[in-house]
Design a protein with these regions (language model features):
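Per-ARNT-Sim (PAS) sensory domains and their PAS-associated C-terminal
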Residues: 81-129
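Sensory coupling linkers of modular signal transduction proteins
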Residues: 120-161
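Sensory modules in modular signal-transduction proteins
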Residues: 8-47, 161
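Short, charged amphipathic alpha-helical "coupling" segments at sensory-output junctions
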Residues: 2-16, 150-153, 157-163
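PAS-family sensory/regulatory domains
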Residues: 54-73, 81
Length: 163
């Protein structure tokens, strides 16, 4: 009887975790070695307009043709082979997924700036057959940095003019 209660508790905990993954304000995508999409959370659904059922088992590149397969495979290679994380920062590449900026009132940016982390998902056998992508919205930070840089330019121009 005690084992049955533990099993029920484990099932409930599993459902809570899945629920959190769906609702968190971060994009989560799980890819296999062929870059087929295995998981697509609510953040990705709401920003891409694509349901999990539409993208599951399709390659990332068939859903997002702007993503260059060779470039992405090069980024993912050490994640699969060395079990290390890889990073794509908005300062180097503003976005991977061209999502609209969903804060059009407060933001002047037309698209969402993103930081992306690729992480290995180690299976029970110890091999990495899947990787996760975590997509963070960096638009507010990017916009703030751009505004600060513009102010610094204006300030230095004013100083040069002797104002």
């Amino acid at each position: 009887f005690l084992m049955a209660n533990e099993a029920v508790d484990d099932m409930l905990e599993f459902h809570w975790i899945i629920d959190m993954l769906q609702m968190v304000d971060v994009g989560i995508v799980v890819l296999d070695r062929e870059f087929k999409i295995k998981m697509w959370n609510g953040f990705m659904e709401s920003h891409s307009g694509k349901l999990p059922s539409e993208v599951r088992d399709k390659t990332l590149f068939s859903i997002f043709p702007d993503i260059k397969p060779d470039w992405f495979a090069q980024k993912a290679k050490p994640v699969f082979e060395l079990k290390t994380r890889a990073f794509m920062l908005w300062e180097q590449r503003p976005y991977l997924f061209k999502f609209s900026n969903y804060r059009p009132i407060t933001g002047s940016e037309e698209f969402m700036y993103q930081n992306i982390i690729l992480s290995p998902l180690v299976s029970a056998s110890g091999k990495v057959e899947h990787i996760s992508m975590m997509i963070y919205d960096m638009t507010d930070i990017a916009s703030g940095k751009k505004q600060l840089e513009a102010l610094q330019v204006m300030q230095s121009e004013a100083l040069e003019r002797g104002a």
